[in-house]
């Protein structure tokens, strides 16, 4: 194909005509394809300069080929470019600038005296036609008379703003309009000053100010300090009353006598939820819903009943939550037994069915109770007085003094215990259980831990304290040391250096000793597991005994558990939420 034919093809419009003859892309040889790929790799590695489009911009070599390649029907020259991927200017919307706005109060142009071609035939204005004219239809239009031609109206521009332009509240605002308000306030202030000056002139002419200056109170400084300010306020009260109606706004209380504005704001002395516990590992605060479900004082050891805020989880158990859960449980049970009820689909039907079920259940219990009483008797035991009367505990009002004596009402009788009280045996002055130490009960008078022992008095206390001192001295001898001399310090340093050398020699022997340590740990863990099993059996036996017949001793120990005991406790602990918990006993 000749060069003239190619130029003619490029100059022809891309309208799909049959006369258009474009050169089709030729098939590349293997050598050309290999060179092209090598050049692309070099450009990606930065060893070769990137391609440049017709605008002089670099083309990123990492852009895929299906994006960077130009279709042959768009650009037959196959020049490297990304113009076809950018927004086309003819498709972009043209928005108005931020300074453009509708013109207000535009003066009308001078009235013309001659009809202009293309103007309204009725009034003669150039801005509209006869069918859009708002004037009264004339008997003979301005086109034929040439008189009373109306001026041209101002045509407002068609503004089209972008996202920010539509939300610009100050667009089109003229700051000079605010000067009118400033001038009005300045006039009011000037009028008040002139009135005040006139009053002072009148008082000076009448002699009131001279009498006030010559008064003894004014000379000795005994005049009330607020008298002058009160006069100033009283002189301005008349002016303030004029504007009191304008100043009265919702959410405010305006007092013209005191000239103050009091805000009706709610006192916020409560603490924000997220400031109650600054520990990041404490209860989570959701800023979107402003909710803190858990108790922020959970890790602080405080009782939830004593704190002012214990989390938002209490809302889950308020209102109709419990009743709704009971209704849902009844719906599930009824569905399992063949009743077609659903809480969300048929709420009214389910509510009526649940109410009738509760009534029938109560009737069935009453019938069952009556049948048992008729068959076996025992109605007289059910007619016994309540437990409050039996234990002499009532809700009668009783008023006490500061010293504990009864002022009004009858003193309440003390509830008697089922156990014997104030029983002192074997010459003891205190009862058994008045002393507690290291998991054992005893007598407070002699610190004895044997229930049926004789009281030894202060001598027993001294013996117990001396035993503690001996134990404490044995443990504290190591901590209390005499001051050392320089020679002793030097000898200790030499010993430490020898120990370090020995440790270096024994490093290669540690591998053999590690196996021995593992065996020892295994044996300790085995013993701890056996002890934990024995403890669980002991606890199980105690729980099977009646609560009133259980012994007084406690399982509590004061010493800290070892690592093996803690590991055994974790291994033997049963978790109710564990799905495999039922298989542990097998």
UniProtKB/Swiss-Prot annotation:
Residues 498-510 have a biased composition (Basic residues). The modification N-acetylserine is found at residue 2. It is found in: Nucleus; Nucleus speckle; Cytoplasm. A zinc finger (CCHC-type) spans 118-135. Residues 235-248 have a biased composition (Acidic residues). Residues 1-12 have a biased composition (Low complexity). Belongs to the SLU7 family. Required for pre-mRNA splicing as component of the spliceosome. Participates in the second catalytic step of pre-mRNA splicing, when the free hydroxyl group of exon I attacks the 3'-splice site to generate spliced mRNA and the excised lariat intron. Required for holding exon 1 properly in the spliceosome and for correct AG identification when more than one possible AG exists in 3'-splicing site region. May be involved in the activation of proximal AG. Probably also involved in alternative splicing regulation. This is Pre-mRNA-splicing factor SLU7. It comes from Bos taurus (Bovine).
